Amino acid sequence: MEHTYQYAWIIPFLPLPIPMLLGVGLLLFPTATKNLRRMWSFTSVLLLSIVMTFSVNLSIHQINSSSIYQYVWSWTINNDFSLEFGYLIDPLTSIMSILITTVGIMVLIYSDNYMSHDQGYLRFFAYMSFFNASMLGLVTSSNLIQIYIFWELVGMCSYLLIGFWFTRPIAANACQKAFVTNRVGDFGLLLGILGLYWITGSFEFRDLFEIFNNLIYNYNNGTNFLFVSLCALFLFVGAVAKSAQFPLHVWLPDAMEGPTPISALIHAATMVAAGIFLVARLFPLFIVIPYIMNLISLIGIITILLGATLALAQKDIKKSLAYSTMSQLGYTMLALGMGSYRAALFHLITHAYSKALLFLGSGSIIHSMEAIVGYSPDKSQNMVLMGGLTKHVPITKNTFLLGTLSLCGIPPLACFWSKDEILNDSWLYSPIFAIIACLTAGLTAFYMFRIYLLTFEGYFNVHCKNYSGKKSSLFYSISLWGKEGQKTIKKKIRLLTLLTTNNNENEKASFFSKKVYRLDSNVRKMTRPFITINQFDNKNTFLYPQESDNTMLFPLFALALFTLFVGAIGIPFNQERMDFDILSKWLNPATNLLHKNLNNYGDWYEFVINAIFSVSISYFGIFLASLLYNPVYSSLQNLDLINSVAKKVPKRIFWDKIINKVYNWSYNRGYIDAFYETSLTKGIRGLAELTHFFDGRVIDGITNGVGVTSFFVGESIKYVGGGRISSYLFLYLSSVSILLLISYFFLNQ
């Protein structure tokens, strides 16, 4: 066993040769490297699979032995200061390593087909491998210095992948927005690390926790409690930015401009999980400061509600899932703030697999839609243009439904077990927080089934002729989350003004993207099913989406299995001779470090009573979403009698106002982006303009004024002189005499 832990250092370094070799190969042998691109992708998957096997082996040893291993190499700079580098293998490390490698492998396999048409195929795999290596280095770090180094590398990789299509201005802007927002958190993290070192004199976690706890409990040592709390707050700010928690969450929806596979990896196992990992790693430090714990739980509950409300009106399928990630990680942050360490990690695990499944499923949908509507994200990711995909992409539909039900908290899927545990703990912590968390669970079920119904149920809206973004029907305006038109729209209006009827069958509709994307020779030839409809003299050919290839479907199957069964590791009850709670055994060393004897077990009766309430709320959200978005109710838009009766009801006006307010709040992202734009962006630009004015008119004015004054004085004196030295000498002596007399006069007074 000891021999196994000695080689744990290979975990972060094994995927590292891929980006290095790809960089050298593309620089020196570009043609040969590109011709062997499938070999590079296979090698990436192979190396990450070896790391996964090693991580699973370490986890099995930890479950059986309940031990923590740390290896450190000391680098002495002088007698007073030395840097120590090493790796730490504990339950948190093993959990995160398995999470990163399993999700990473699925994303790499999926990306082989998804990115096959892209010119940056090899660059994408280089970034992805470096991303995985950086995240593995982060979770195996044994001190704060290593944490910060890999923290920055994880951020750098995420910026590169968010702006992967950097020629698109919107992607470049999203990359810059993520960078600037995370700079705030990273600066806070750096200040916190420096402050802790100034207080404790150590970067190592175990030494740091022991010294910090002694300083907190011994008030006579002169340590300023406010300064200690401020350092902990700075550390938490870093986690807030990385995990897209309020108020530094604004970068997350814009990060969807990157390729869909990287969205899955960022939201499941790397970027946003890094912030949760940091709080979990420093949990022994935070838990001794009640004010910080209360702040963590407060930020968590605000993020839970905010993320859920912002997801209600999104039409972009990826942005809807992004806000879902923000809300679900809020549950994890709430659990950490309440002190529920086990529940937080449990929900991090279950959410990661469910969200990876949903993002890869959305990528499969987008991939199939691109052949119909073009490569513009405004079209291929727009749920308004989808609908009726059940019969066209049945496998994607079933796996997406599984992930949706899991995120809604429906038993026996993964997220049910973890979310239910957090909800139960919240009732003991704060009834107000518990009420908000439970209501948000219903909102989660509502917006997740909204995504599912708009995408898969009904009819394929691209070819729908009797479709308009604004209808007089209450049901239809709700289902699209659009504002109701003031006038009744005629049925002959098509989906969008871009969808026009073309009698010339050789002329493509203007809706399709006019921009030509050049595909390389490795693009697989794909045929799309189509239906030809002859109506009198018009002949219309309709294309429909097609199911993705097996290399994209295999990760969906694998993640669906994880979504089904991963919740079994944390079933929170222990009955006669039956111990299902593998997670508690796994976390024993960590809970012992916290000096807590947590009892996570309950009986079946208590568990069922608590679960019935949370599941009922989720089913109510699903029912409400089905009521508003089900195609059966949407078809009622054609019944003018119902619409006329509904308009006469007085409550209809009040109901429409509520809908519009919720829509405006959600569609405008809670006006938070606008507030930042007004207060920060425009404020900084105004300050820059003021500084430019002061520098140009005042500073430069003084400098130039001295020069101009000297010039004119010199010119004036030039005409006074007559060219005789005796005159100059007389003038000089006279001036000196006058100055001496003036000085003498003032001194005597």
UniProtKB/Swiss-Prot annotation:
InterPro entries: NADH_UbQ_OxRdtase_chlpt_su5_C, NADHpl_OxRdtase_5_subgr, ND/Mrp_TM, NU5C-like, Proton_antipo_N. Disulfide bonds: none annotated. The keyword Transport applies. It is found in: Plastid, Chloroplast thylakoid membrane. GO terms for molecular function: NADH dehydrogenase (ubiquinone) activity; quinone binding. Its EC number is 7.1.1.-. Pfam families: Proton_antipo_C, Proton_antipo_M, Proton_antipo_N. Belongs to the complex I subunit 5 family. NDH is composed of at least 16 different subunits, 5 of which are encoded in the nucleus. This is NAD(P)H-quinone oxidoreductase subunit 5, chloroplastic. It comes from Vitis vinifera.
